[in-house]
Amino acid sequence: MKTVSTKSALAAAVKAARAAGKIMRDNWLKPKRVNSAEAHDIKLELDVRCQKLITKILFAAFPKISLLGEEGDAGDADADYRWVVDPIDGTVNYFFGMPHACVSIALQSKSDKWRVASDKKNTRRRAQNLLTPHSSHITILGVIYDPFTDELWTATRGGKTKLNGRVVRVSERAQIGEAVVAMGFSKSKENLEKSLPHLIRLARSALKIRLMGSAALELAYVASGRLDLYVERTINLWDIAAGALMVECSGGECYTLPAPGGKLRMCADNGLLRKKLQLGSLLK
């Protein structure tokens, strides 16, 4: 497959994110049909409906690009490019009427062109770049849309992260006592037990701790300097693919490690805090 125009792909992703965001906004306070309810999680019919709309828009623009999504995959799994989609990140918040949820869309490539360019530009961060140490794909653009605030974050590899068209950067806070830190909690007993001691330690040392329930938005907030660090022990690729690129493109770092079941361990920060916090046991 020939090289995809990032400008055209970004435009398609923005269109799809806004369309799905409109569905979210229009149905926010209406009764919602639950497809499944598991321990600590909810799956909505609206998740499926939003992903179907996103898929339709993206495939109309790029029919040969595959899609990996929270609500299922589409297209040729061996394609050189793939979309990575979370149609509603923060579904539990959304279901309970809390306006903290978003649409997250990333485009990834297998091409070594992007990997080489990324490594040359980010030699200092080479070990931190999202998935480059342990994946055949590299994220080349990301879009996150919050339909409740009408905030749209965009990033393309090698460029700057933008919020509603304006460049944003990570914070410059270097002391944990000045930092606002967010954590996410996975659903297994083991991961909860490993995460809680770190939550207590961070709560004692950080300025404030936040548990906000949307990994994509937390990463967008790190990229914008609203949060200083976000950490989660077990998370899916579609939750973080777009946001991790945004953190990197705004001057921060996103450190990931593979976890069981195809999941990831992740810590994103402004580039000044992670190594000071000794989070190694949380990410193992």
PLM features: residue spans?
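Oxyanion/phosphate-interacting regions
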Residues: 1-11, 15, 193-204, 217-284
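Residue-level detector of anion-binding/catalytic polar loops
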Residues: 23, 64-66, 208, 228, ...
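DPxDG-like acidic metal-binding loop motif
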Residues: 78-115, 125, 129, 134-162, ...
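Short loop->beta-strand "edge-of-pocket" segments that line small-molecule binding or catalytic clefts
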Residues: 168-190, 203-212
